[in-house]
């Protein structure tokens, strides 16, 4: 009710507006006149998506149609997407319009197999349709996003967590910054950029906010998981983006990627959005099998008609198995994913369409062991269950509100990581199990034992979003007003980190930082709520149409309020030329891994009296407990700017876009100097079969160590240019050409000072204080896609030529001289420009921090071939070869060859419609 009242107040601002409640009726059918139930219709100028009823019928307000025409996109599973423009005059003459869709196969002309610019929700939107997904023979979303301009085309990798970054040249591996293929190399800059992308599946947000599958943050100074500690597969995506491997490509109908300014309805993001629409429609059984050398993937789906009363049911199943190295049994991957979607009409009078969907996924490879090791076993289990209820209704004529959209979802995951190995306790590993400060008695671990570390997480996410909208006419302008409210609760109800102190991996109190258990349940939680208001303006002018989407999002996150204004503008001229601009601010809530780090336990052995007699044996250690939580941690946010121009006619379209994106308050770990006075003890006497007597040995010793705390330290400024074009048909060759040229530049560094890691208590300056390091990267990447289709044969060839023209990494903007130091009283002392270069502080100067300037020494081209053949209307055979010419240029650096292209990979795909 509050939502309706608020929207009424907004509508009151248009008191003199001409409100029209007239409708037109659309009927969506196939070429045989058979109705297509629950087809999707997108009114692009208004940014609205509608769903037809069980008879393929849909009512639209005539106010949505302008004199210069409104563009509609109509889609249905198994049918070719159709785009058409309908003018207001045509609507006035015909109140009923029939739209027929063709079967989607290779016998149609002009099959699009590339990502295309489609300004639906944003000027920067890129659309990847099902034909493109089939052409690249994608196994998961990780392969699909490689179709985006500027993204390297890589071999499928199911053994490293895959993430996406947009509009940046951030390097994942600073040790080898020119390696475009090290997708598993994460640093804090890349992690923040990937974490800031929102993923929305059929209107339901996917979240990685409460993923806590990590070892101690304060102990290691970042996100450290089993793959780093125990050399297993890299499943690391804590505090990073969603793992794209877990979203199978077989169930996806289309993907819209917003790399610039997203509409106000999308929140909890700072670096763009990925909107995924899955396959749903009335279809026969369809199946697909894809095979590579080390990957097997099978999928099956069907759309069932349940009658007019009960609507339609879609079922999809996907199975994938992969082996990275047949010699290493710890590195296999097997997953299964199930999806069921039920769509039905609740009320035809209200045009109330409702959809209930259920998703379940699980890895099924179970416990993995190394047969060559005495005992070395690892297990990574991940189960996900997601339930979503979404729908839309359009009240009758003369209602205050044109439509209401709603989306409610529940997501529950079980994440489990385990590693165990046999330990021969030759070093007398100690048992350190104290959770409090002070001295503690202990004993040595058994001579032989199995060390076990488990991390058990159960992320829970509840979300709700309700949006009401109203379309109004004011003179020649059309306003589509939207008002939404949202709420989101997330928590982690897992057992947490489970560690048996009596069977340690490391050397307990002799090693500094010890392992402890850490419970997640009733501790890890996030709450967000807010509202947004948006106006979509469409104004016909003498020379074209002006469209503006302006919105304001107000939300409460991380115990603070945030306001995000956003605007997308476009002026489309009648001659096909258009100009656009956009600006927006967006906020991303910090991950719980940063908000709720576990305590750090500094354990120091102070007394040792070993004996084979358990009554005489005694060890003591001192524990200091540190809480690394930063209560002042803020949400990272981004300013995004964008300008561009585009041109389109019947056979050719192109766009040129420039962007500037400033990321502020990115999260990284800061080393904090910690001091601990330790008094050692020595044995005074040893009575037979009794505890020893001990006394202090010498003076207390000062122990210096570090722990790590999360802070808003990172800054990055990203700028670039994107040129994209598409030529449908070069006659008489019948060749389609799609190209993209992308230049990205990124400047990224930490803000504030940093403390050196070298400590010397005998010096006047215990440790140095230095200016932050700065890095910059830029790159130029082009992709040329050549498509030859022979519709009469159902045959299509696609050749993708990708060039890395240059990649450059520069570390600069600092010097080797300290800006200050920490004295023996552990106070900070700062130096002026003359003092910092004094020979008195020579020992504080950095020796390994000279500026680095690395450039790609050669131009690196690559070529990839795809071939698909339709046999009849049921069977499709496909093959693709990455690096088809096996061109692998290399350079030698420090006696080692560095290759710039991956080895060739061949994949086969067989699809069949029963």
Where are these predicted regions, by residue range?
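N-terminal periplasmic "start-of-domain" segments of outer-membrane beta-barrel proteins
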Residues: 40-42, 48-57, 110-139, 144, ...
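Outer-membrane beta-barrel signature, preferentially recognizing the C-terminal barrel domain
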Residues: 587-664, 684-694, 701-729, 775-778
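Outer-membrane beta-barrel transmembrane domain signature of Gram-negative proteins
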Residues: 434-546, 587, 595-598, 718, ...
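C-terminal beta-signal and adjacent terminal beta-strands/loops
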Residues: 227, 662-665, 669-671, 803-825, ...
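Extracytoplasmic beta-strand/coil segments of soluble accessory domains associated
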Residues: 142-228
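Gram-negative outer-membrane beta-barrel transporters
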Residues: 542, 658-662, 681-813
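N-terminal periplasmic accessory domains that precede
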Residues: 94-100, 141-144, 162-165, 200, ...
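Short, acidic, small-residue-rich periplasmic hinge/interaction motif at the N-terminus
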Residues: 27-31, 39-42, 73-79, 91-134
